[in-house]
Amino acid sequence: MDINKMFFDENEKPLDRLVSDGGYAAVFRSFGCIGDSLSSGEFEKYREGGNGFYDFYEYSWGQFMARMCGSKAYNFSKGGMTAERFLDGFGVECGCWNPENICQAYILALGVNDILVPGMDIGTVADVDLDDYNNNADSFAGRFVKIMQKCREVQPDAKLFLVTMPKGGYFREGQDEQADKHQQLMYDIAETFGNTYVIDLRKYGPTYEGEFGNGIYMCGHLNAAGYLLTAQMIASYIDYIVRHNLRDFRAVGFIGTRHRNIKVPEKE
């Protein structure tokens, strides 16, 4: 076993190694998946007069990932969800911050229905008050980080993972630029917020086009194979993050217990 190659290979890139058993993402016993239709296993059915949209949570990438890791995943998501709607009631409705649903890690995959709306203000980290989320601006950035802050309010030690938008799919003209801004915002938030990591599917994931795109999409949403692939990518990305930042995750087992303040000694 080559420990250096497994944990400290500087040439390894995220998703170079695709895991099917969750890998080191399995160090988390609970995940909260905050998102929209693509976090909800939504299938789209073609029909004349308007397509049908149906959330099949058992097919969501979160539930595929839970089955891989042997962990518990909570779907705090719904088709069409935005950061604004989440804060205006859905977060409470779905029980995101209920004591019995508090998670060790939260994976936030929101933004498609927010930033692709013409005229939507994406905002910047300057829109965020780290001391009082009630002062956050009414931009996507302000609302998105408020969701993060409320997660940290109920679980101060939770690890947060922010997902960028893959390339391809059904983006229309001009929307790729918005998705690029969203990608940069995720990095800016992670740097500002702390204990937060970016799952950059836009940079390291595949482009959803051609034969591949047609194979994993069903109309405008992913099919079962597409959601399974997404679960493998997100689990593999978290596996990569944990392996390359072992010190950051030494006390994961204490998250949500009375031992959260125990200091981890250094080895000589």
Feature locations, PLM:
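Oxyanion-hole/transition-state-stabilizing segment in secreted/luminal serine hydrolases
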Residues: R85-D138, G168
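A structural motif corresponding to the C-terminal end of an alpha-helix
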Residues: F64-K72, K146-F161, L185-I199, I241
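Alpha-helical scaffolding within the catalytic cores
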Residues: E58-S60, F86-E100, V145-K150, Q184
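Acidic/histidine-rich helix-loop elements
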Residues: S40-F56, G79-R85, T124-N134, C219
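Catalytic His-Asp segment of secreted/periplasmic serine-dependent ester chemistry enzymes
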Residues: M165-E268
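Structural recognition of the beta-strand scaffold that forms the well-ordered cores
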Residues: S30-I34, S39, K72-S77, Q104-A109, ...
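Solvent-exposed loop/turn segments at secondary-structure junctions
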Residues: S37-S40, K78-E84, V112-V117, P166-Y170, ...
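Serine-esterase "nucleophile elbow" of acetyl-processing enzymes
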Residues: D2-S77, G95-W97, R247
